[in-house]
């Protein structure tokens, strides 16, 4: 690409077009803080993203993280100290011990999902393995019964549609219906946990207290919604997109099978490569010049996490999928005060499923090696919509 890309960074089709990374490459080389055809500013280099995240007093979350929508009443759209208090309250459900305690149940769930397809010799990796796993894990934490998981998956997809791109009136209504249903379900769950606490996440959040403060029912609804969306879509897309790269780079697949100790590094490379959260916005609190571009108070600047993860100044041969990449300081979980609260849980899910796929479906392969797999046209969280795979049938464990 020799000319400035003529793109709309708020249009989900840009992220599904397979042209985004070439556009990012031009931005990083020529205009680290780029303006799209509509004037939206975007930080494209690793250093620009980091520099913005290190100055939350100048680059604020409080105006909303989406380019064309106002802030929502959840901690991701807050600055400190309000954000820090809310984060401390929610963090009670994501301590290292609570995540570690879920390992056995997540491992069993991975085997159950593989059991459901292993005798067939074929499946859609997204539909049958990548999508059900995080939804089941998050669903269990939010009090969702197994028979309700498909319903929750639909709600999550519908709600992310609203946050992800230009939406039609029909899509807007679908989103509002999904939120109303989620709101009713969650308020009923909150009431039940107040009356009869269990060990699930909702019970922990209901009883969480910091400096005498507790979460109200309204706050519980919004923060569990953030957990649902963040915990479902991101892990799903990393698992599917990362596995796609292992299958397209067979030497990396074979390397992991020979040496499973490389799996932690492979998970980090899957996260870097897929960068499921494509971007977030920050609002300027003052006029400034930033990496060569004049910015005005009140405007939004997009942080292009995916572009930062492919910055040649930071990552050697960034277009090469390398499970032994070291160092690998990717920004898939963000950076700074808003670093992803669920990163330990996501890494655990990715590791447990990938280890089992490598071991139980050792000759897993794409149905068509040269196929271009469809990406979700979304400007926030995006990844593969479908990935047909085949493998040698094997008996289930259960």
Curated annotation (Swiss-Prot):
Enzyme Commission code: 1.14.15.28
InterPro entries: Cyt_P450, Cyt_P450_B, Cyt_P450_CS, Cyt_P450_sf
Gene that encodes the chain: cyp142
Binding residues annotated for heme, in chain numbering: 340
Keywords: Cholesterol metabolism, Heme, Iron, Lipid degradation, Lipid metabolism, Metal-binding, Monooxygenase, NADP, Oxidoreductase, Steroid metabolism, Sterol metabolism, Virulence
PROSITE patterns per record: CYTOCHROME_P450
The protein's annotated pathway: Steroid metabolism; cholesterol degradation
Inducers of expression: By cholesterol.
Biological source species: Mycobacterium tuberculosis (strain ATCC 25618 / H37Rv)
Essential cofactor(s): heme
GO cellular component: peptidoglycan-based cell wall
Source organism, top-level taxon: Bacteria
Enzyme class at the top of the EC tree: oxidoreductase
Regulation: Inhibited by econazole, clotrimazole and miconazole.
Gene3D superfamilies found in the cross-reference section: Cytochrome P450
Catalyses which reaction(s): cholest-4-en-3-one + 6 reduced [2Fe-2S]-[ferredoxin] + 3 O2 + 5 H(+) = (25R)-3-oxocholest-4-en-26-oate + 6 oxidized [2Fe-2S]-[ferredoxin] + 4 H2O; cholest-4-en-3-one + 2 reduced [2Fe-2S]-[ferredoxin] + O2 + 2 H(+) = (25R)-3-oxocholest-4-en-26-ol + 2 oxidized [2Fe-2S]-[ferredoxin] + H2O; (25R)-3-oxocholest-4-en-26-ol + 2 reduced [2Fe-2S]-[ferredoxin] + O2 + 2 H(+) = (25R)-3-oxocholest-4-en-26-al + 2 oxidized [2Fe-2S]-[ferredoxin] + 2 H2O; (25R)-3-oxocholest-4-en-26-al + 2 reduced [2Fe-2S]-[ferredoxin] + O2 + H(+) = (25R)-3-oxocholest-4-en-26-oate + 2 oxidized [2Fe-2S]-[ferredoxin] + H2O
Transmembrane segments: none
Function: Involved in the utilization of cholesterol as the sole carbon and energy source by degrading the side chain during infection. Primarily catalyzes the sequential oxidation of the terminal methyl of cholest-4-en-3-one into (25R)-26-hydroxycholest-4-en-3-one (alcohol), (25R)-26-oxocholest-4-en-3-one (aldehyde), to finally yield the carboxylic acid (25R)-3-oxocholest-4-en-26-oate.
Similarity comment: family membership: Belongs to the cytochrome P450 family.
Pfam family, one: p450
GO biological process terms, semicolon-separated: cholesterol catabolic process
GO molecular function: cholest-4-en-3-one 26-monooxygenase activity; cholesterol 26-hydroxylase activity; heme binding; iron ion binding; steroid hydroxylase activity
The protein's name: Steroid C26-monooxygenase
